[in-house]
């Protein structure tokens, strides 16, 4: 009998790192420096070296990281932040926290990332609504960087800040630049299912600005000044936990190896499925970390395909079934242009297959064979 197939196999990674992680966590516990202990600084320094950036500041989670970046920019009510609608809610949620307005833009059909061609339309939408455009949040969805040459040019010309929401794409590269070297800020999430994940919640902000880094370190610690009981700004409580930092140090040590393993899994999927279904595409000179491996299937048959794969013990997931502009909490916010048709279409078609560095070839062959059998048996499923 075939063992259960994990959508993301965290147990396999834990087994590989068990001794090192347990030793690191125990050392953090025994040090009794549970808040901003030395492991936090060590992790921040090692992650900065990994990115090739000047500063990494750990936070409690990736959502807080976005919020703190916006706070660092002084975002307030009346400001507009341009962001894609086809993403997890955290991207726009942090904007709404501050009373600012997210302006939703459509995505590129192939990459699922923000379509740079929509940015001028979003800018006009913001100005027509009497809002002050302040920043663009680009999301590195499913592990692939956004099209940053075009996005950076737009932000530079319009004097807008650029925040790279790399919760899913941290560790990816865009034309020789690793995430963390792009934009004014890069935010990371270390939620356990992310390519670089901890054993709870965690996040980070990457920046090359000394001035911004100083403000961020203050904001994550209640807006403190030189002393923790001196408060120079309104901040929040969002510090990376010492034990999680200790775990992340060990995970970072094997991260490059896992990125390569994820690419090997993606290559096998591509080879086995490209002729029967629309497989993911990565932009030239870019490298994805493959947080998800996402197909596009006919929306009339997606549920049937998922059910058939489930009957064979193969888990699947839909990221995301509904764009943010169609969700109750975000319907009141503006969209650029006459709706977001590409986002709406993608939401009806996307289907993600199991993806993690420890997906062995035999199991993956079984998944590929099962998908092919389902698709070839129902030609209308394939896009």
Language model regions located:
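Conserved coil-to-alpha-helix start sites within the AMP-binding
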Residues: 87-92
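N-terminal "arm"/small-domain region of PLP-dependent enzymes with the aminotransferase-like
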Residues: 1-33, 38
């Amino acid at each position: 009998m075939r063992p259960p197939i994990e959508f993301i196999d965290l147990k396999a990674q834990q087994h590989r790192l068990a001794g090192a992680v347990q030793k690191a966590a125990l050392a953090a516990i025994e040090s009794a420096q549970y808040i901003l202990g030395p492991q936090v600084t060590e992790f921040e320094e090692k992650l900065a070296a990994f990115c090739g950036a000047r500063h990494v500041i750990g936070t409690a989670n990736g959502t807080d990281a976005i919020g703190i970046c916006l706070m660092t920019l002084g975002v307030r009510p009346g400001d507009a932040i341009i962001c894609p609608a086809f993403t997890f809610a955290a991207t726009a949620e942090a904007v709404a926290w501050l009373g600012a307005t997210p302006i939703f833009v459509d995505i590129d059909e192939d990459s699922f990332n923000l379509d740079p061609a929509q940015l001028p339309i979003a800018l006009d939408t913001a100005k027509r609504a009497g809002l002050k455009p302040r920043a663009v949040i680009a999301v590195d969805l499913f592990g692939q960087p956004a099209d940053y040459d075009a996005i950076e040019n737009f932000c530079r010309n319009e004097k807008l800040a650029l925040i790279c929401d790399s919760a899913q794409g941290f560790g990816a590269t865009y034309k020789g630049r690793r995430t963390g070297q792009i934009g004014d800020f890069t935010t990371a999430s270390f939620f356990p299912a992310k390519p670089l994940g901890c054993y709870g919640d965690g996040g980070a902000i990457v920046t090359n600005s000394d001035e911004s880094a100083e403000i961020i370190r203050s904001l994550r610690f209640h807006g403190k000044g030189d002393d923790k009981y001196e408060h120079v700004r309104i901040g929040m409580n969002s510090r990376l936990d010492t034990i999680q930092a200790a775990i992340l140090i060990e995970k970072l040590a094997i991260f490059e190896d896992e990125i390569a393993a994820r690419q090997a899994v993606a290559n096998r999927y591509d080879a086995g499925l490209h002729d029967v279904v629309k497989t993911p595409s990565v932009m030239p000179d870019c490298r994805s970390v493959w947080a998800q491996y996402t197909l596009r299937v006919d929306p009339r048959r997606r549920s049937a395909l998922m059910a058939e794969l489930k009957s064979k013990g193969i888990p699947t997931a839909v990221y995301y079934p509904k764009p943010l502009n169609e969700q109750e909490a975000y319907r009141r916010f503006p969209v650029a242009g006459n709706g977001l048709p590409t986002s709406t279409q993608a939401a009806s078609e996307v289907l993600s297959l199991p993806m993690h560095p420890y997906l062995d070839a035999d199991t993956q062959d079984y998944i590929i064979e099962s998908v092919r059998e389902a698709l070839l048996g129902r030609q209308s499923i394939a896009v």
